[in-house]
Amino acid sequence: MTAPSASIRVILAEDQTMVLGALSALLELEPDITVIAQTANGRDALTAVTRLTPDVLVTDIEMPQMTGLELAASLRTTHPNTRTIILTTFARPGYLRRALDAGARGYLLKDRPAAELADAVRRVHRGLRVVDPALATEAWNAELDPLTERERQILQRAGDGRSSTEIAAELHLSEGTVRNYLSEAIAKLGASNRTDAARIARTKGWL
């Protein structure tokens, strides 16, 4: 398909092949939107954005190698003219707050009608912000994330099953420092251990 001169150039990032294909097919039905690349992980998405400089990146929030949140934060600095829309199956207020803090211009649930995604692409391209209304209301009333960025990094890895030794090596910290951060996170969340703390934080959208 040949893109019209005024077409909005979009890159899609989604690790589920069927969902990726469906999103691409739906957006390609729009006469003013062209999908110029499809990627299955965050690193490939970042590479594609760097190479193709799209108008809009539509990305899943949970991605291998680099999450949608990490992508949005990176692009805000390195490619400010590419606007990010995050799609998610998780109606968690904490995710929305983190997405907006990362610089995402749109945040939608995957179960919304296809026409809403196309409209969101257009509005974000014009410089507007698009947020699912129900999620916006929940986020306004939700409790604030008490975790620091470092606590979040460490707790996420602990929740994935990494040991303190592995986390320390990966983040270039001492094991004692890792344990201190974990203790702080556990206390803030009122959890019984690191696994429980990670579960609580994920439920609230803080990881």
Write out the residue ranges for each language-model feature.
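Conserved acidic segment of CheY-like receiver
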Residues: 6-19, 23-27
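Short hydrophobic/Thr-rich beta-strand motif most characteristic of the beta2 strand and flanking loop
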Residues: 32-40, 48, 191
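Acidic catalytic/metal-coordinating carboxylates
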Residues: 41-44, 67-71
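Active-site beta3 strand of CheY-like receiver
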Residues: 52-58
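Active-site residues of response regulator receiver
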Residues: 60, 88
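Receiver (REC) domain active-site loop signature in two-component systems and cognate sites
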Residues: 63
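Short, flexible helix-to-coil linker/hinge segments that flank and couple to helix-turn-helix
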Residues: 94-153, 206
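Recognition helix of helix-turn-helix DNA-binding domains
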Residues: 163-196
